Structure formats: structure tokens, C-alpha cells
Amino acid sequence: SGCIFRNITDADAIRLFTPNLTTSTGYIIEKLGLKGQRIGGAQISEKHANYILNTNNAKASDVLKLINLVKQKAKENLDLDLKEEIFYVGDFESG
């Protein structure tokens, strides 16, 4: 398993004044207040916000909705375009 999103760029870390100029997308997701957020059986991890957990028979659509929620909130609140580092398999688009 691995993280859902790539780390942010150094330029974005500077622009957002992240602590110690961290490029951690987990930090960004936590600051957006999304740690622990659930959709269906999918949940953003309480331990590391750049992971999505299957807590109760999550569907691929649940995971995709969470990913899109994070991307939407990052764009709306921070003018940040997050990029996934996962690969999509199947008959759906990444958003």
C-alpha cells in the first residue's frame, strides 16, 4: 500500500507557509479537517491522512468520492491542485 496523493511542490510549501516547509500532503489533508472523513465504507486514515482505509466493505466509488472531496477542498481552500500517485484500474475515470 502507499499514499493516495503525491507530495506538494516546494513552491507550494513556501506559498502555504507549511511548518518547516513540509511537502507532506498528509499534513495538508489534516489541516483541511478531513482526517477521519468517511464516505460509505472508505475512511481517510486517522493515523496518516494520505491513506484511505476500507473500514466496512468500501466500494471503489466510495474511495473515488473521498479522493475527489480532498481534491475539491484543497483547490477551494488553498488553490492547490493535488495529484494522485495511485493508478486506477477498471471502467471509471479518476475524476
Predicted regions and their residues:
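Phosphate/pyrophosphate- and phosphate-bearing ligand-binding catalytic cores of soluble enzymes
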Residues: 1-63, 77-95
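Conserved ATP-binding N-box helix of the HATPase_c
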Residues: 74
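Phosphate/pyrophosphate-binding loops and the adjoining catalytic core of nucleotide-dependent enzymes
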Residues: 70
